């Protein structure tokens, strides 16, 4: 997993509440098993007018000024519903690094973290201010300081200390296990065999 320390990008507002994992990534795309390639299907029912991937020009992700946005500003209860990790894969593959919401579905919140994204909880007034930024305005998220820096203000956020450590050091669960590889090998070498 890549380290996440300080990230600067532009925002895209999608202020709907209760966007569930089926809206983020519909069930018909769950048969793919590689994390890559899901970005095309992100918000499928909203982004496209038909099954030929004709873009809906009114959907915010399809507007030219927001196409390169990497920070999503959204409503309450983002990622509710089923526990499909594919929804987080779709967000990451599309290019999002940060999702700022009023709240998150618990499992989806952890899925974002497990995939190197930073989910941040902020109150409505902060999200509304960020949603009203110009598409070219830069927003910086500093994980070490736990702060968001933007043209409309500076905002603090909370994150669990263990997750903060993992993101700052680019460690997923496998990476943490590998930190103890020598100890694991030593244990296995000295462990009595019960099958002889």
From Swiss-Prot:
CDD domains: IPMI_Swivel (cd01577). It catalyses: (2R,3S)-3-isopropylmalate = (2S)-2-isopropylmalate. One of its GO terms (molecular function) is 3-isopropylmalate dehydratase activity. SUPFAM superfamilies: LeuD/IlvD-like (SSF52016). GO terms for cellular component: 3-isopropylmalate dehydratase complex. Keywords: Amino-acid biosynthesis, Branched-chain amino acid biosynthesis, Leucine biosynthesis, Lyase. Pfam families: Aconitase_C. One of its GO terms (biological process) is L-leucine biosynthetic process. PANTHER family: 3-ISOPROPYLMALATE DEHYDRATASE SMALL SUBUNIT, 3-ISOPROPYLMALATE DEHYDRATASE SMALL SUBUNIT 2-RELATED-RELATED. Catalyzes the isomerization between 2-isopropylmalate and 3-isopropylmalate, via the formation of 2-isopropylmaleate. Heterodimer of LeuC and LeuD. This is 3-isopropylmalate dehydratase small subunit. It comes from Streptococcus gordonii (strain Challis / ATCC 35105 / BCRC 15272 / CH1 / DL1 / V288). The gene is leuD.
């Amino acid at each position: 997993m890549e380290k996440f320390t300080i990230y600067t990008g532009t925002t895209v507002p999608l202020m709907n509440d209760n966007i569930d994992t089926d809206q983020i990534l519909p069930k018909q795309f769950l048969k793919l098993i590689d994390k890559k390639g899901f970005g095309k299907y992100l918000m499928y029912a909203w982004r496209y007018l038909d099954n030929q991937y004709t873009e809906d020009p009114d959907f915010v992700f399809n507007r030219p000024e927001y196409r390169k946005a990497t920070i999503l500003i959204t409503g309450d209860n983002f990622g509710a519903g089923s526990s499909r990790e594919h929804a987080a894969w779709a967000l990451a593959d599309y290019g999002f690094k940060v999702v700022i919401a009023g709240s998150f579905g618990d499992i989806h919140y952890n899925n974002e973290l497990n995939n190197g994204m930073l989910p941040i909880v902020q109150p409505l007034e902060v999200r509304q201010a960020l949603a009203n930024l110009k598409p070219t305005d830069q927003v910086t998220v500093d994980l070490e300081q736990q702060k968001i820096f933007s043209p409309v203000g500076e905002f603090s956020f909370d994150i669990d200390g263990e997750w903060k450590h993992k993101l700052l050091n680019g460690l997923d669960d496998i990476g943490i296990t590998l930190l103890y590889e020598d100890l694991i090998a030593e244990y296995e070498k000295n462990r009595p065999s019960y099958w002889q």
